[in-house]
C-alpha cells in the first residue's frame, strides 16, 4: 500500500523503523493572499471561498461531518476536500491531533495553538512576511518540534495553505532548484505558466541577492507562514524521532528550506530521520514531476497507493481525473494507517466512504 519512489533503501529503512508505531498528527494552518488570485488554486471554487478553506478543513479534521459547522467545507470545482481522508484515518486510528495557527486572517472555530504569526501578503509583492515574524515562527517551530518529539514516536506534519504550491515554487526557485515545471497543483492540469509568472514577479521585486539568498530572508520575501514553522519543527523533531512530512510539492519545499536553515543557522538535525509522504495522485501526476523534484531536493519520497477508481462517490472518483490530489496531510495519514494498523485499499476506502456517507447525510439534512 506504500510505494517508495526515491532513495528506496533509506525510505524502506524509515518504514521498517516506524512500522507499528502510532504517530501524532500536527497540522499547520496558514494563509497567503497568493491563494486569492483568480485561477491560482482549485481548493475552493472562488477566491472568496478560498479565504475559508483552511479553517473549514481544520474544523472538519477534528469534528468530522456536523449538521451545522461554523465554517462548512467550501464548494470545489470538482472533487471533495482531502480532509475526508485525513479525518477517516484520525478517527479510525485515534491519532493525537495538534492544530497550529501559523497565520490565518480568521481563527478556526476549533481549538488550535496560536503561534503568533500573520497571514502572508501575495508573494508577487516580494515582501510576503515581516522578517521579525519569520524569526519568531522559526523559534516557535523549533520549540514545538522538540515538545512533540518528547511525547510521540514519530510526527506526521501536515498543512493547509491555499496557494501553497505557488509559494513552494518560489522557495524552491530561490534556493536554486529548477522547479518551474515540476510542481503540482489542485488543478487536473497544473497551471505552471501562471505560477511561474507570479514567482518571477516576487523574486524580481524582492531585495534578495539573486544567488544564494539567506533562507529566512527568502521566506520573508516570497514564502508563507506554514513553511517556516514546519521547517523548524522538522529540524528539532528529527534530533529525537522520525518525521513524515505529509504533502507533495509544499513539503519538498519545506524539506529544502529546513536543510538550508540548518546550514545557515548552524542548527543540528538528522535529515535521515525525515521523509516526505504523499498520495499517488501527486507522486504520479503527469502534469508535474514530483519524483524528479524529490530527486533534486535529495529526499526519500513515499506515496500511498490509495485508489478511488471503485469509489461509490463521484467526488472521490474525481481524484483519479487529477482533481484535488492531496492536502491536510491526506497522503501521510493514509501511509500512517498502513504502517500502524496494516490498513490496505479496502480498509482505507471503507473508512473514507463512511465519512463520505455521514457528510452526505448531514449536508442533505441541513440543506447544504
From Swiss-Prot:
One of its GO terms (molecular function) is nicotinate-nucleotide-dimethylbenzimidazole phosphoribosyltransferase activity. It comes from the Bacteria. Pfam families: DBI_PRT (PF02277). InterPro entries: Nict_dMeBzImd_PRibTrfase, Nict_dMeBzImd_PRibTrfase_arc, Nict_dMeBzImd_PRibTrfase_sf. This is UPF0284 protein Cyan7425_0342. Belongs to the UPF0284 family. CDD domains: DMB-PRT_CobT. The lineage of its organism: Bacteria, Bacillati, Cyanobacteriota, Cyanophyceae, Gomontiellales.
Amino acid at each position: 500500500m506504500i510505494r517508495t519512489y526515491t532513495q528506496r533503501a533509506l525510505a524502506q529503512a524509515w518504514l521498517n523503523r516506524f512500522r507499528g508505531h502510532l504517530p501524532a498528527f500536527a497540522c499547520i494552518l496558514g494563509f497567503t493572499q497568493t491563494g486569492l488570485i483568480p485561477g491560482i488554486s482549485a481548493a475552493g471554487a472562488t477566491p472568496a471561498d478560498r479565504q475559508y478553506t483552511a479553517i473549514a478543513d481544520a474544523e472538519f479534521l477534528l469534528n468530522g461531518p456536523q449538521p451545522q459547522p461554523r465554517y462548512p467545507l467550501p464548494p470545489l470545482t470538482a472533487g471533495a476536500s482531502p480532509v475526508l481522508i485525513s479525518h477517516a484515518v484520525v478517527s479510525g486510528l485515534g491519532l493525537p491531533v495538534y492544530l497550529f495557527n501559523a497565520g490565518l486572517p480568521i481563527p478556526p472555530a476549533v481549538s488550535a495553538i496560536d503561534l503568533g504569526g500573520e497571514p502572508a501578503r501575495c508573494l508577487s509583492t516580494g515582501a510576503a512576511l515581516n522578517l521579525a515574524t519569520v524569526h519568531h515562527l522559526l523559534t516557535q517551530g523549533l520549540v514545538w518540534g522538540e515538545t512533540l518529539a518528547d511525547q510521540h514516536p514519530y510526527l506526521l506534519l501536515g498543512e493547509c495553505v491555499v496557494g501553497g504550491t505557488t509559494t513552494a515554487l518560489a522557495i524552491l526557485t530561490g534556493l536554486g532548484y529548477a522547479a518551474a515545471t515540476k510542481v503540482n497543483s489542485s488543478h487536473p492540469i497544473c497551471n505552471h505558466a501562471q505560477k511561474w509568472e507570479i514567482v518571477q514577479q516576487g523574486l524580481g521585486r524582492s531585495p534578495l541577492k539573486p544567488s544564494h539568498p539567506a533562507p529566512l530572508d527568502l521566506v520573508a520575501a516570497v514564502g508563507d507562514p506554514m513553511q517556516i514553522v514546519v521547517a523548524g519543527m522538522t529540524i528539532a523533531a528529527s534530533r529525537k524521532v522520525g518525521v513524515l512530512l505529509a504533502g507533495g510539492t509544499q513539503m519538498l519545499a519545506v524539506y529544502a528550506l529546513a536543510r538550508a536553515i540548518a546550514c545557515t543557522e548552524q542548527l543540528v538535525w538528522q535529515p535521515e530521520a525525515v521523509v516526505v509522504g504523499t498520495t499517488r495522485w501527486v507522486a504520479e501526476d503527469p502534469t508535474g514531476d514530483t519524483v524528479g523534484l524529490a530527486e533534486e531536493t535529495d529526499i526519500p519520497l513515499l506515496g500511498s497507493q490509495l485508489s478511488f477508481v471503485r469509489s461509490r462517490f463521484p467526488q472521490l472518483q474525481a481524484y483519479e481525473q487529477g482533481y484535488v490530489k492531496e492536502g491536510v496531510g491526506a497522503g501521510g495519514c493514509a501511509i500512517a494507517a498502513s504502517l500502524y494498523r496494516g490498513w490496505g485499499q479496502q480498509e482505507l476506502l471503507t473508512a473514507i466512504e463512511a465519512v463520505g456517507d455521514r457528510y452526505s447525510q448531514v449536508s442533505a439534512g441541513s440543506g447544504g
